[in-house]
Amino acid sequence: MRAATQVLGCRRVALIDVDAHRADGSENIFAGDASVLLLDSFQATAFPYGVAPATAANVTNMPLDDGTLGREALARMEAEWLPRLYDFAPDLIVLSIGFDTHYEDTQTLLKFSEFDYAYLTRLVMRAAHDLCSDRLVSIMEGGYNKKALARSVLAHVGTLVQ
């Protein structure tokens, strides 16, 4: 994020983090930084445990209950995050996507599918097109089920290159 503002000249950067684990490190770094918007979804019962409220106005946490379906999470993201993202009007969007939310991943308890990852990717790509001339960085975080991870990465990257 700092490189985007310092090197690329971006005034505002949005970080969208979809993962089974809370982006507490990112939140600790960027809380209170008006040049960064952090939108974070995570499994409420995954480490680090707890559903503490966001620590600053530029942070939106979306804890997800165990068993939350991808389509349910995506509906919430569209309703709660998109207005915030469009109001923020970033110069760059960073999508940090963890495939440990997949329903076949036995280490976590969320129920996303590869179709959900493709939908999320399209949603963020559309926002990047509308807001920041398609400036989008994708960071893939991983997952624990190798077969589900492979299909999920393929769905995500395949959508990015369409």
Question: What is the predicted function of each stretch?
Answer:
Residues 1-130, 157-158:
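Conserved alpha-helical scaffold segments that buttress catalytic/binding sites
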